[in-house]
């Protein structure tokens, strides 16, 4: 909210609000998670001012609720995100993404020789953490990649 208490992005009656998305990541989330494959209204705020982050993106999807699996898959791209469930214009639930053990159907294997790049199979990566480092291991070629390598693809 701004200092004059006006919303910069219109409130929704019922649905999901993904807040505290790093700036410039909102569109990527819409695409990767196929959030636009709905006939429901989607409101996007890009480069909004944020006290914590400087700038942030925001996504509001009416009449749609994310599964726990979807929320947790957001952790790769937006680990500080907050996912709010809205009902009758009120926040009725909040959750924070945490890295899942596997990420399915979202990422593309960066190995150009991987079968998943040419065959119609769903992508699947095991998530491995070593301290703060996140490695992703492709189910098909069994190669491990640093998080930033997979996300750049």
UniProtKB/Swiss-Prot annotation:
Residues that bind Zn(2+): 109, 114, 138, 141
Molecular function via GO: metal ion binding
Organism: Cronobacter sakazakii (strain ATCC BAA-894) (Enterobacter sakazakii)
PANTHER family: ASPARTATE CARBAMOYLTRANSFERASE REGULATORY CHAIN
Classification lineage: Bacteria, Pseudomonadati, Pseudomonadota, Gammaproteobacteria, Enterobacterales
Keywords: Metal-binding, Pyrimidine biosynthesis, Zinc
Cofactor(s) needed for function: Zn(2+)
Cofactor stoichiometry and binding remark: Binds 1 zinc ion per subunit.
Protein name: Aspartate carbamoyltransferase regulatory chain
The keyword Acetylation is annotated on this UniProt entry: no
Annotated GO biological process: 'de novo' pyrimidine nucleobase biosynthetic process; pyrimidine nucleotide biosynthetic process
């Amino acid at each position: 909210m701004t200092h004059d208490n006006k919303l910069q992005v219109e409130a929704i009656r019922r649905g999901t609000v993904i807040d505290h998305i790093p700036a410039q990541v909102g569109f990527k989330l819409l695409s990767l998670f196929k959030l636009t494959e709905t006939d429901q209204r989607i409101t996007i705020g890009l480069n909004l001012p944020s006290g914590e982050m400087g700038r942030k993106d925001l996504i509001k999807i009416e009449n749609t609720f994310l599964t726990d699996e979807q929320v947790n898959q957001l952790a790769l791209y937006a680990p500080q995100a907050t996912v709010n469930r809205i009902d009758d214009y009120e926040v009725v639930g909040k959750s924070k993404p945490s890295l899942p053990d596997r990420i399915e159907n979202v990422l593309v294997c960066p190995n150009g020789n991987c079968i998943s790049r040419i065959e119609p199979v769903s992508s699947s990566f095991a998530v491995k953490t070593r301290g703060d480092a996140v490695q992703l291991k492709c189910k098909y070629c069994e190669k491990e990649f640093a998080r930033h390598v997979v996300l750049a693809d």
